Amino acid sequence: MNLKDRIGADLGRRVSLEEGIAWAAERGVKFIDAQLDITPNGLTTFDAARCDAIREAAGAADIHLGLHTLSGVNIAEYSPFLSEAVDDYLKAYIDVAVRLKAEWVVVHPGHHFGDKEERMEAAVGHISKASAYAEEVGATLFLENMNWEPDLAEVHYLAHTLEEAQYYFERLTLPSLKWSFTVNHAHLVPDGIDGFIDGLDMSRLGEVRIADCTGEYEIHMKPGEGNIDFGHMFERIEASGFKGHYMNAFGNLEDMNDARDYLVERAVVAGVDAR
């Protein structure tokens, strides 16, 4: 599979999965993911009939489907009732992934309000339970490194620094859990994209998520509008032996499709074999 075919588009909650598959098939996009929290893709709407039809449509178009949980759901919950709800939420996503034959589910490390250590411990517990269940049913989870928030913000995402990401991956070792590398998030912290590549186990890399930014704030810009060196990024990641997919996550669907050519061009200029 050539590099362009390995670059997909994040449907998010923009369209139904059925519409998203049709859109991707028309444009030759081979990788898509979607969030299933609200209409038109609410988790509870995926009965056997709907899952069968989606599986058939994706298979016929040779489209690889993934799911993406909502980062606003705090996976680092430790409060009674809410903690149990987190486990149920992740299990429900995994169950739908199995029914859809979705190849991955992106999960998040949670967020904290100043109680970082307690939240990280709770998050590892929830993700450990989810990855054990995924292992049992044949699903794969991708844990995403998150974005920095301004220092005076009340809420802060976890695993936005290399050190925090290492905390998670050192404790979550089942094969069913891999890494979703969001490069624009890494670009917001001193570690940078290179720091994450050097500091985490690249053999666990499941996907690379792409948007541009200026390194100042969490803004998902189209590649070329910020200052990320995408040529260098591709050079480093491809040199690691990574053969998986990249996922565009910015703008609208057409922006993400159009940017695939720009990204391939940046890779080729950097000496990457895009064939």
Walk through the language-model features, giving the residues of each.
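N-terminal small/glycine-rich loop or linker at the start of catalytic domains
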Residues: M1-R6, G66-E77
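Histidine-acidic metal/acid-base catalytic patches
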Residues: M1-R6, R14, E18-E26, D87, ...
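Active-site-proximal loop/turn and secondary-structure-junction residues that shape catalytic pockets
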Residues: R13-V15, L36-I38, S71-V73, P109-F113, ...
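Active-site acidic/histidine proton-transfer and metal-coordination neighborhood
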Residues: V15, E19, E56-I63, A76-K178, ...
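Conserved beta-strand positions in the central sheet of alpha/beta enzyme cores
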Residues: D33, G66, V106, F142, ...
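Glycine-rich, proline-tolerant flexible connector loops at the mouths of alpha/beta enzymes
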Residues: D33-R55, D115
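Short, flexible/disordered intra-domain loops and linkers
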Residues: N41-T45, D151-A159, K222
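Catalytic-core regions built around general acid/base machinery
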Residues: A48-D62, K129-Y133, F196, H232-R236
